[in-house]
Amino acid sequence: FKASLDNSFRLVFFIAIPSLIGLIYFAEPIIASLFYRGEFSEFDVIKSSYSLVFFCYGLPFFMLMKVLTPAFFSRQDTKTPFYVALFSLFLNAILNYIFAFKLGYGHAGLAIGSSLAVLASSCILFFVLMKQNLLSLSIIFHKTNFAAIFSSLIMFLAFDYFVGIDS
């Protein structure tokens, strides 16, 4: 079980890190190619790309939730993910209110709040599994994760060199 969980973590990071980097750097062109026509203006593209970028920061944690939650279910523990999800729901509502309305980030604030809430809930589930000796912090510092970061950096530098992207 522990080996399967470790492999799942490595796979999540291997997929999430390059996706995160790519989506952040290409947020505007992606939004423009999908929606920039008709009533959707350049201003809308820029504002929508902010939301995409802030959701991207939560991408690894959204993906980790798909690994962490079934890890509890497979051990017949449905209460822990339930209580963490309930906490995350309230935290998400509070953070969305703070970022969207009090700090004035608008729709991008909703993305920030959602990303921070999923970060908190995935960290809680991760540390509960760590306490049960099913995970260790060493999985975060695995060489696969560094390879994903390095390959993402190479990808960005190659696009920057060949396409001339402003960074």
Regions found by a protein language model. Give the residues of each.
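Membrane-embedded alpha-helical bundles of multi-pass transporters/translocases
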Residues: 1-167
